[in-house]
Regions:
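Transmembrane helix interruption/hinge and helix-loop junction motifs
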Residues: 53-57, 119-127, 261-264, 327-332
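Substrate-agnostic recognition of the 12-TM MFS/MFS-like secondary transporter fold
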Residues: 5-44, 60-119, 129, 134, ...
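Helix-loop junctions on the cytosolic side of multi-pass membrane transporters
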Residues: 54, 81, 85, 127-157, ...
Length: 362
């Protein structure tokens, strides 16, 4: 059920991603973020009302998750595409690290606060906190000036042509193409395996639901540490090499998790934290790399393409991971996925066009 809920929240975003990217590069990015946040809040408000009048069904939840995904398809690329218009180029990776800190804090505090509030109030009232948060975000954007990239005057604009241009920006750059390919391949294994973490706690380590929740929080704590490392200063390092090292580190944590004994829950928690660190460092390095190497006027399309290309194979993995875990077992699934991610990381180091990308002058 969790896998299908995740698919409901990802499928619309992946389908319309290339279209939204072209629109983001065409429209006012500040307004896009404000409207997207408002739309997402409206979906949550409708769900709260359905619970309040006691008619909420599973299909309502899945449908509204899908609608929220449409809002996210606009919001996330617009936000990432706006950062280079506000910050110096040499600070972009550091800012991406700070964003990882913010995301990690919300991932740690959000579930904990939600679990506490659900014991006090009904779910419809708890959902209103999400609505209130969106209203605060939209209001704060009123006071922020976000410039839009310069557009060529007198040029006929065609959305399909702009989508093709976004794809060609990636394909024409061999280094960027390889990095995208490796990222898509890794996402195919990382995102589905993340669904198995609670099952590892409950079924393999014979843990409790509380311990399963702790593991989810520990990943976010690791991501918080990784974000803090990347946000602390500007590092003079090849970001492509850093991304590849994080592939190896993340794959190793999955592989070692698969060989742990049933009484190795503490080590599972340690490996989960390290995996969280690797994920945050990777995300900060990758985001900063794209923001540095791509013109601001095309970033909406490139980020949308990236999200789409990453999410589609990840969803295929989500569909198949249950069958894989049932057929091979939980630990074998971790060992297999971790080993493949390590192989991808090694292959990435042996790809000269990708390794040269962050050495090239902008």
């Amino acid at each position: 059920m969790l896998a299908w809920a995740a698919i409901a929240g990802l499928l619309p975003q992946s389908i319309i991603g290339p279209f939204t990217g072209a629109l983001i590069d065409r429209w006012n990015r500040k307004r896009i973020m404000m409207l997207a946040d408002t739309f997402i809040a409206l979906c949550t408000l409708i769900l709260a009302i359905l619970f309040w009048i006691d008619i909420a069904q599973v299909w309502h939840i899945f449908g509204l998750l899908a609608l929220r995904s449409i809002g996210s398809a606009f919001h996330m690329p617009a936000m990432q595409a706006s950062v280079p218009l506000l910050a110096p180029t040499d600070q972009l990776t550091r800012i991406a690290g700070v964003n990882q800190i913010i995301a990690s804090v919300s991932q740690i505090a959000g579930p904990a606060l939600g679990a506490m509030l659900i014991t006090i109030w009904k779910i419809e009232y708890v959902l209103l906190f999400d609505v209130a948060g969106a209203l605060i975000a939209v209001t704060s954007l009123f006071f922020v000036h976000i410039p839009n990239p310069e557009k060529e005057e007198g040029v006929e604009r065609d959305i399909l042509k702009e989508m093709k241009e976004g794809a060609m920006i990636i394909l024409r750059n061999k280094g960027l193409s390889w990095i995208f390919l490796y990222d898509i391949s890794v996402a195919f294994f990382i995102i589905p395996i993340s669904v198995l973490f609670p099952l590892m706690t409950l079924d393999y380590f014979n843990g409790t639901e509380f311990q399963a929740g702790i593991i989810e929080a520990i990943w976010s704590v690791g991501a918080l540490i990784g974000g803090a490392i990347m946000g602390a200063k500007v590092y003079k390092i090849n970001r492509v090499a850093l991304i590849n090292w994080m592939y190896l580190l993340c794959g190793l944590t999955f592989l070692l998790t698969g060989v742990l004994p049933t009484d190795g829950f503490v080590w599972f928690a340690v490996l989960t934290a390290i995996g969280g660190v690797s994920g945050a460092v990777y995300n900060a390095a990758f985001t900063g790399l794209l923001q540095t190497k791509i013109e601001p006027g095309a970033l909406g399309r490139v980020f949308s393409m990236f999200f789409t290309f990453s999410l589609i194979p990840a969803m295929l993995g989500l569909v198949g991971i249950g069958f894989l875990a049932d057929g091979l077992g939980l630990t074998t699934s971790f060992i297999l996925s971790g080993s493949i991610i390590i192989v991808i990381g090694i292959a990435a180091f042996l790809t000269p066009p990708a390794m040269r990308l962050d050495r090239q002058k902008d």
